[in-house]
Amino acid sequence: MGGCVGTHHDSSGSLNENSDGTGVALGRNQPLKKDKPKWKSDYPMTDGQLRSKRDEFWDTAPAFEGRKEIWDALKAAAHAFESNDHELAQAIIDGASITLPHGALTECYDELGNRYQLPVYCLAPPINMIEEKSDSETLDIPEPPPNSGHECQLRLRLSTGKDLRLMVRSADTVYHMKRRLHAAEGVEPASQRWFFSGRPLTDKMRLEELKIPKDFVVQVIVSQPIPNPTPVEN
């Protein structure tokens, strides 16, 4: 998770102090380096799971300390960086007056001295990526027998800010619970990414196998369609 701590620094940035007087070595501002971080996930990750992990970070990071406009700039810079558009990434960083002591987006400071940290998974995919399941595989998930398992309520927290209790059955797969959520809230299954305790839940997992304690919350990241830009009138 990204973090933010209050500091004060000038353009030289050699040493600055937090409010408690503790020195923080920032180093001079450096241009963004082109080298992408190489990292390995704790588990083999699909492209969809990586997107969900990133969505979760960008949805929650601005809720902590730091300025939203800086988080927005960092998100845009991270996207440009991963797309190998280093000139655009550097222009975004410069335009937002963001300082990079080590030339990397993993540690940044705004002009007020606030610190921002981007996780490596927002900057590059892991070396152990695996292929996404095809739609045909999802369609192959068998329907559970009618009335199989026991009925229960599952607490969900949507990234839209809504909390709800969904009636499910213990024999349901994650995919079938997504369909239940679609019936209740109109959210397409393909737009849902489910997480429990930070772990992504794949479509074929069954609720009874997940052993989710009663009243624990399952996070659902809802992918929002990108709105069409509003035309600017002359």
Swiss-Prot record:
<dbReference type="InterPro" id="IPR000626">
    <property type="entry name" value="Ubiquitin-like_dom"/>
</dbReference>
<protein>
    <recommendedName>
        <fullName>Ubiquitin domain-containing protein 1</fullName>
    </recommendedName>
</protein>
<dbReference type="InterPro" id="IPR038169">
    <property type="entry name" value="DC-UbP/UBTD2_N_sf"/>
</dbReference>
<dbReference type="InterPro" id="IPR029071">
    <property type="entry name" value="Ubiquitin-like_domsf"/>
</dbReference>
<dbReference type="Pfam" id="PF00240">
    <property type="entry name" value="ubiquitin"/>
</dbReference>
<feature type="compositionally biased region" description="Polar residues">
    <location>
        <begin position="12"/>
        <end position="21"/>
    </location>
</feature>
<comment type="function">
    <text>May be involved in the regulation of cellular senescence through a positive feedback loop with TP53.</text>
</comment>
<feature type="compositionally biased region" description="Basic and acidic residues">
    <location>
        <begin position="32"/>
        <end position="41"/>
    </location>
</feature>
<dbReference type="Pfam" id="PF16455">
    <property type="entry name" value="UBD"/>
</dbReference>
<dbReference type="InterPro" id="IPR039869">
    <property type="entry name" value="UBTD1/2"/>
</dbReference>
<feature type="domain" description="Ubiquitin-like">
    <location>
        <begin position="152"/>
        <end position="227"/>
    </location>
</feature>
<feature type="region of interest" description="Disordered">
    <location>
        <begin position="1"/>
        <end position="47"/>
    </location>
</feature>
<dbReference type="InterPro" id="IPR032752">
    <property type="entry name" value="DC-UbP/UBTD2_N"/>
</dbReference>
